[in-house]
């Protein structure tokens, strides 16, 4: 039968069996007929495919036709003039800022007290755990007045002393040895004894009824914080007012203060603010050297640069809280670059911030851009860089250098820099309890591998360091624009430097350091 299926035997060579495979009657046509049919079918398929492809050509990307929402000029304008926060306190809307009192801007919740006989370990724990910028020292828990402060600059000076990196001058040797005797006998080391060996800056107080004008003039002269007291209650402390809080307040409410608001769109180079002298350290230098530098110069932060003076990071006195654990001992002898990686790692683990902090502006930045960045990063100063300078220009940067900031005439001058401290015979202390150094036990200096300063992409990160602009510079500008006559900030800088250098000097031997913290807990 024509319709009957033929069966083709296919031999399975693997097992020798025969498998029947059905084949339709159409397959029984002659080979030439089948070949012609297949060619026609294939030709029709190709025709259909090409026609289909022509109809289904990939459409153009909408992004190619979409116009940018902001022009380059608009983006630059937004960078130069960032919008201030909209959540302005209605209590200050429409008011003359010169009539607002500092008592309205402080809170008793900011006050953290310790007593003169509080132990150094307890005070350090409190400073770190409460995240307070400063502790107020009083005579007794019942007193409402203060006799001193304890902050991270004091903690830095104390750690240098405990690690044997500094020693007192001759006039302070007797109280220093008395402190060492207390340590040997296992007694608590009170704050008043430690403060006697450190920097002794006078307390600056202002009444709560003082206007912001008084605060601007005081801060513009280089004072970093004031103790706010209630003159009606025998000088009872009611708050702490700082440079940062004032700058933040004026920025957030600037639209209500025309005298200040008109300054924000202007460029740093035109305003003539900033310091031509800037302290920096090469990233390959040891961490202990930058701690000594901050202590001897009386400053709270130092720019870290690569071999061509490009800014690659920032180390401040606040970062010393990462050095109060026993596991932190080797960091003192590791490089500054390595410590910056530790800072960023700790910030990511504790605060969930994994971005690289931005601590620089350039002479072409507006005051608004500068202040917005200061407020956003909670910084006290920003490094001024020249982003157009080639990374290969200039010789390798020494550990202590200064740059020239191309600002307008008559910029704020800073005094010449004092020579950097040197050290010899540095002992290796051991920290047996969370925040208290104890006797050295000869731990070797373990240097962790880190990227050398010569290999850092500093030119792409920032630019060549040429100056610094601080909260003091900005408030000094506000004071002068308001018709005030603030003191020269250079005088306060010199006073802090003299206070630091007269209190401690660089160690030449580790003998006293070994005696100071000879007890174990």
From Swiss-Prot:
TM spans (from-to): none
Keyword Repeat appears in the UniProt entry: yes
Amino acid composition bias (Polar residues), ranges on this chain: 1-18
A cellular-component GO term for this protein: cytoplasm
Residue ranges, compositional bias (Pro residues): 413-422
Biased segments, Basic and acidic residues type: 508-521
Location(s) in or outside the cell: Cytoplasm; Nucleus
Ranges annotated as biased composition (Low complexity): 21-41
Pfam families noted in UniProt: CBS (PF00571)
Keyword RNA-binding: no
GO biological process: cellular response to glucose starvation; regulation of mitotic metaphase/anaphase transition
Region of interest called Disordered, as start-end residue ranges on this chain: 1-70, 386-437, 484-521
UniProt KW keywords: CBS domain, Cytoplasm, Nucleus, Repeat
Domain CBS, first and last residues per copy: 106-171, 199-256, 274-331, 335-391
GO MF term set: protein serine/threonine phosphatase inhibitor activity
Gene3D superfamilies (alphabetical): CBS-domain (3.10.580.10)
Primary location recorded for the protein, binned into one broad class: cytoplasm
Function: Involved in DNA replication and cell separation.
Record-stated family: Belongs to the SDS23 family.
Protein name: Protein sds23
């Amino acid at each position: 039968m024509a319709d009957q299926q033929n069966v083709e035997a296919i031999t399975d060579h693997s097992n020798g069996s025969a498998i029947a495979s059905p084949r339709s009657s159409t397959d029984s046509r002659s080979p030439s007929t089948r070949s012609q049919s297949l060619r026609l079918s294939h030709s029709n398929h190709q025709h259909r495919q090409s026609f289909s492809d022509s109809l289904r050509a990939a459409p153009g990307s909408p992004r190619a036709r979409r116009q940018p929402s902001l022009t380059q000029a608009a983006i630059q304008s937004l960078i130069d003039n960032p919008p201030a926060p909209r959540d302005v306190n209605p209590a200050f809307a429409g008011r003359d800022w010169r009539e607002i009192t500092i008592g309205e801007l402080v809170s008793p919740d900011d006050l953290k007290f310790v007593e003169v006989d509080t132990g150094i370990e307890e005070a350090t724990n409190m400073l770190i755990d409460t995240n307070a910028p400063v502790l107020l020292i009083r005579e007794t828990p019942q007193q409402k007045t203060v006799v001193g402060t304890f902050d991270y600059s004091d903690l830095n000076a104390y750690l240098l002393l405990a690690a044997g990196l500094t020693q007192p001058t001759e006039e302070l040797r007797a109280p220093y040895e008395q402190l060492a005797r207390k340590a040997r006998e296992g007694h608590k080391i009170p704050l008043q004894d430690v403060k006697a060996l450190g920097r002794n800056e006078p307390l600056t107080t202002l009444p709560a009824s003082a206007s912001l004008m008084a605060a601007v003039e005081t801060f513009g002269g280089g004072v970093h914080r004031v103790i706010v007291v209630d003159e009606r209650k025998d000088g009872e402390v009611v708050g702490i007012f700082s440079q940062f809080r004032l700058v933040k307040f004026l920025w957030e409410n600037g639209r209500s203060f025309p005298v200040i608001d008109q300054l924000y769109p202007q460029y740093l180079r035109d305003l003539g603010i900033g310091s031509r002298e800037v302290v920096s350290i090469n990233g390959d230098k040891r961490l202990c050297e930058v701690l000594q530098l901050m202590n001897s110069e009386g400053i709270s932060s130092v720019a870290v640069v690569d071999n061509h003076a490009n800014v690659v990071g920032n180390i401040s006195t606040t970062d010393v809280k990462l050095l109060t654990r026993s596991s932190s001992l080797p960091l003192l002898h590791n490089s500054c670059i390595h410590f910056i990686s530790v800072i960023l790692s700790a910030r990511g683990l504790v605060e969930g911030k994994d971005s690289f902090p931005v601590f620089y502006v350039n002479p072409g930045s507006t005051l608004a851009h500068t202040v917005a960045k200061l407020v956003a990063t909670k910084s006290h100063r920003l490094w001024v860089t020249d982003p157009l300078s080639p990374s290969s220009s200039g010789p390798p940067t020494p550990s202590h250098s200064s740059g020239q900031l191309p600002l307008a005439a008559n910029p704020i001058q800073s005094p010449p820099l004092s020579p950097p401290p040197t050290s010899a015979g540095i002992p290796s202390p051991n920290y047996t309890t969370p925040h208290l150094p104890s006797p050295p036990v000869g731990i070797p200096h373990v240097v962790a591998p880190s990227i050398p300063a010569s290999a850092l992409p500093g030119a792409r990160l920032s630019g060549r360091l040429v100056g610094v602009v601080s909260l003091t510079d900005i408030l000094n500008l506000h004071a002068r624009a308001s018709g005030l006559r603030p003191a020269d900030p250079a005088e306060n800088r010199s006073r802090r430097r003299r206070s630091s250098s007269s209190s401690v000097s660089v160690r030449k031997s580790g003998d006293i350091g070994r005696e100071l913290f000879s007890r174990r807990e």
